[in-house]
Amino acid sequence: MSAFITNFQSPVEMQDLEDRFRRGGISNLNMLLHWRQFQPLEWTVDKQAVVGDTVLFMCAKTSVDHIERLYTQIRKAGQKDSALGRFAAAQQALYKKYAGCIVAFGRVAKEPFPTEAPGWDAPYWRSPWYAEIDHILLLDMPIHISQFRDFITVSRTGAITRLNTEQWAKLRTLIAT
């Protein structure tokens, strides 16, 4: 079995934020923080993932910039107090708290499968590979990238960063402490 980091974002474009709002105010971070409400949780994975692999969920550092830009657009349009504005403000606070952190981990429960319809109108991600994830554990103390960037380089071009045995062992030690 192996491990990989899946790096997820806040909504990137206004259409994505509006879509998330219309569908119950659910961002990627909300889905993860409240994963029991979304069982079975399906998430983007490495297409070579196998059942039993460990998935580490990391909130992208750039999420703060994206959600701030969208919230600024809403404020400039005079919609700060609208339902969408309140949703954006709440998302901004959440993403500020978790950006750059591994917030949870889980296990690949079923073989990866491709899909062309991820269920959202305007997804920012391009990977068609998903898998059902179970045994999710939210970290009481999220692990900031500054704690592991000296031994793991998180991919900036894709959502998935595969970990070698040594990297995973060091990261497990951080999680355990």
Model-flagged regions — what are they?
Residues 1-87, 148-156, 161-177:
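Compositionally biased, charged N-terminal/linker segments
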Residues 76-168:
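Aromatic- and Lys/Arg-enriched surface recognition patch
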